[in-house]
From Swiss-Prot:
One of its GO terms (cellular component) is protein-DNA complex. GO terms for biological process: negative regulation of DNA-templated transcription. Can also bind other divalent metal ions (zinc, cobalt and nickel), but these metals are poor regulators of DNA binding. Homotetramer. Binds DNA with a stoichiometry of 2 tetramers per DNA. It is found in: Cytoplasm. This is Copper-sensing transcriptional repressor CsoR. It comes from Bacillus subtilis (strain 168). PANTHER family: COPPER-SENSING TRANSCRIPTIONAL REPRESSOR RICR (PTHR33677:SF3), TRANSCRIPTIONAL REPRESSOR FRMR-RELATED (PTHR33677).
Length: 101
């Protein structure tokens, strides 16, 4: 059975939206490198944990944005084209994985 997402891309995203997501991820990458430096420099564990929590929150925000965008565009388009059942099933699977974290 072919997966719904094998041929899908972020085509519906504007260049500005892609840049915003990329910039968010680059900031998160910088935060993670900062955490790595904190560990290497034997910083206080609580300070490191606070930074890890901030990274987790930032990643969750990016994921929520992508999840919302996917529902509004990809899933909605699939429903309109008659392929909604598979798209909804895929969305629910992703949502279940997302809520486990």
């Amino acid at each position: 059975m072919e997966k719904h997402n094998e041929h899908k891309t972020l085509n519906h995203k504007s260049s500005k939206e892609k840049d915003q997501i990329t910039n968010r991820l680059k900031r998160i990458e910088g935060q993670v490198r900062g955490i790595q430096n904190m560990v290497e420099n034997d910083r206080y564990c609580v300070d490191i944990l606070v930074q890890i929590s901030a990274v987790q929150a930032a990643m969750k925000n990016v994921a929520l944005h992508l999840l919302e965008d996917h529902a509004h565009h990809c899933v909605a388009d699939a429903i309109k084209s008659g392929d909604g059942e598979q798209a909804i099933s895929e969305l629910l699977d992703v949502f279940k994985k997302f809520t486990k974290s």
